UniProtKB/Swiss-Prot annotation:
Record field: catalytic activity: N(4)-{beta-D-GlcNAc-(1->2)-alpha-D-Man-(1->3)-[beta-D-GlcNAc-(1->2)-alpha-D-Man-(1->6)]-beta-D-Man-(1->4)-beta-D-GlcNAc-(1->4)-beta-D-GlcNAc}-L-asparaginyl-[protein] + GDP-beta-L-fucose = N(4)-{beta-D-GlcNAc-(1->2)-alpha-D-Man-(1->3)-[beta-D-GlcNAc-(1->2)-alpha-D-Man-(1->6)]-beta-D-Man-(1->4)-beta-D-GlcNAc-(1->4)-[alpha-L-Fuc(1->3)]-beta-D-GlcNAc}-L-asparaginyl-[protein] + GDP + H(+)
Organism this protein belongs to: Drosophila melanogaster (Fruit fly)
Name of the featured protein: Glycoprotein 3-alpha-L-fucosyltransferase A
Cofactor needs: Mn(2+)
Originating gene: FucTA
One GO term of the biological process aspect: protein glycosylation
Membrane topology, Lumenal segments: 29-503
Pathway annotation: Protein modification; protein glycosylation
Lineage: Eukaryota, Metazoa, Ecdysozoa, Arthropoda, Hexapoda
Length: 503
């Protein structure tokens, strides 16, 4: 029997298929052998890759340094040496070290507290310099409102030190701040005393009340009342004119002079130097609530208290309280109510508040943007009572107060609806106590006003590009800044500060 003939073409295809099968089989065998080897070889390769990556990061840092305290992070308690330095100084980690248990990580020492906290010891370092224009802009310290409009920038200012600060100190040159209304209204001494006693990170400033220095001072600072100097200032002048207001627009001066003021210092968050009545700062912004060992409602038999002496406030707070009284017990102490508690025995009054009452009316005398005073921070949050607030907008309390630490009247359509919710809280200890979980997660810090003024005055980059309030009066008391009614339907005012630069 004759064998069938196979063409050369078929031989080629058969050979190709056999070769592919052999290659596939060899690949499978090699993979099995690789798996049986010690993991040490792969670990060494991983370490080599990590070392190469670390070397690349170090090279990048040398070419483009990372930002330091010139742009501090929002968490004050974690303001530690910059990431770039950590990358250089930390020893190489093995794969086993990277797989360290979570329990071991939790045993690491806590981050060092920044200097403005109680017992805080960490002070900022001078900012780094950048030769590249884009890098300078990207890492510029966010000290002014246009650089960070969604923050009060207080922490940024507290942690700012100019890059050439050592040269400034060695030169002996000081920034002169002229208090045009005199030293008395500020209760300070001339010279550097206020900066040195506060241990400011930047203390190369001096105070004076000598108006003869009006043409040469680095800053002219007005308190509550603007007075024209009569000196014509060159257009390229780096001198700063700053106006300080403590009270709300209803009780402050009208300033109708255009382009007379380029910095402001008020309780408003869009001021150049924000000067709040109090400043709450978390130790760690990731930890804003924690369980409490205290039942804040225990043995409290009374509902709502209010200490008040001004019965004619223009926001209608007294009328609101009287309406609230129709639906829940409200004890009004002082000239506007039937209960008495003298200011001379304030401590005793607050003991009554702590021991007997569950709620406190922290009502401001005016409904103005960002206007939150000691009525809330001191009289309420420092006590063991839940504050009900009226004054600033709901969003202002959200960014200024500890999370879930109060109730805003504008969360409810009427005093009756508010009273219904207060009754729910009165009968639910767990829900009531949930409003106190913020306690222990941070503290009210000293904002060191003079330290921040001095530090910001050393930001030469921004002094070369001055900004002016074209209409300070409109910025301070324009539409949407204050209201005599509820905030629920208000319209935000336009931004009126001029911007001549192209940042």
């Amino acid at each position: 029997m004759r064998r069938p003939k196979i063409s050369l073409k078929k031989y080629f295809y058969l050979t190709l298929i056999c070769a592919l099968l052999l290659i596939f089989g060899f690949s499978l065998k090699e993979r099995e052998i690789w798996k049986t080897l010690s993991p040490r070889s792969s670990q060494i390769t991983t370490q080599q890759q990590q070392h190469q990556h670390l070397h690349q990061l170090q090279s990048m840092d040398e070419e483009h340094p990372m930002a330091t305290s010139s742009t501090p992070p929002p968490i004050a308690a974690t303001l530690l040496p910059e990431v770039a330095d950590n990358l250089v100084e930390e020893p190489e980690q093995t794969v086993l070290e990277e797989e360290e248990s979570e329990a071991d990580r939790l045993q690491e020492p806590p981050a060092e507290k920044a200097w403005f906290f109680k017992n805080g010891e960490y002070y900022p370092k001078p900012a780094k310099t950048y030769s590249n224009r884009k890098a300078r802009k990207r890492h510029a310290p966010r000290l002014l409102p246009h650089q960070d409009p969604y923050s009060d920038r207080i922490i940024n200012q507290l942690m700012y030190v100019p890059h050439n600060y050592e040269e400034i100190k060695s030169s002996g040159k000081l920034k002169t701040i002229l208090l045009y209304n005199g030293l008395g209204p500020w209760n300070v001494k001339k010279g550097r005393d206020v900066f040195l006693k506060a241990k400011c990170p930047v203390d190369t400033c001096e105070l004076t009340a000598n108006r003869d220095l009006a043409s040469t001072a680095d800053m002219i600072l007005y308190k509550d009342h603007y007075i024209p100097t009569g000196i014509r200032r060159p257009s390229n002048s780096k001198q700063v004119s700053m106006l300080y207001y403590l009270e709300c627009p209803y009780h402050t001066q009208n300033v109708k002079v255009p382009d007379a003021i380029n910095w402001t210092a008020t309780y408003r968050r869009d001021s150049t130097i924000v000067a709040p009545y109090e400043k709450w700062q978390y130790y760690d912004t990731k930890v804003q609530q924690q369980e409490q060992d205290i039942n804040y409602s225990v043995n409290k038999t009374k509902k709502v208290a209010w200490f008040v002496s001004n019965c004619g406030a223009r926001n209608g707070r007294l009328q609101y309280a009287h309406e609230l009284q129709k639906y829940i017990e409200v004890d009004i102490y002082g000239a506007c109510g039937n209960f008495k508690c003298s200011r001379s025995t304030a401590d005793k009054c607050f003991e009554i508040l702590d021991n007997d009452y569950k709620f406190y009316l922290a009502f401001e005398n005016s409904n103005c943007k960002d206007y939150i005073t000691e009525k809330f921070f001191v009289n309420a949050l420092n006590r063991r009572v839940l504050p009900i607030v009226m004054g600033a907008r709901p969003e202002d309390y959200e960014v200024s107060a500890p999370r879930r630490s109060y109730i805003h009247v504008d969360e409810f359509s009427s005093p009756k609806e508010l009273a219904e919710y207060l009754r729910i809280l009165d009968h639910d200890d767990e829900l009531y106590n949930s409003y106190f979980k913020w306690k222990g997660t941070g503290e009210f810090i000293n904002t060191y006003y003079w330290c921040r003024v001095c530090a910001t005055l050393h930001n030469e980059e921004q002094l070369r590009k001055p900004r002016w309030y074209t209409d300070l009066n409109d910025w301070w008391r324009g539409p949407g800044v204050c209201t005599t009614r509820s905030w629920r339907n208000f319209k935000a005012r336009k931004d009126v500060i001029s911007d001549s630069s192209d940042d």
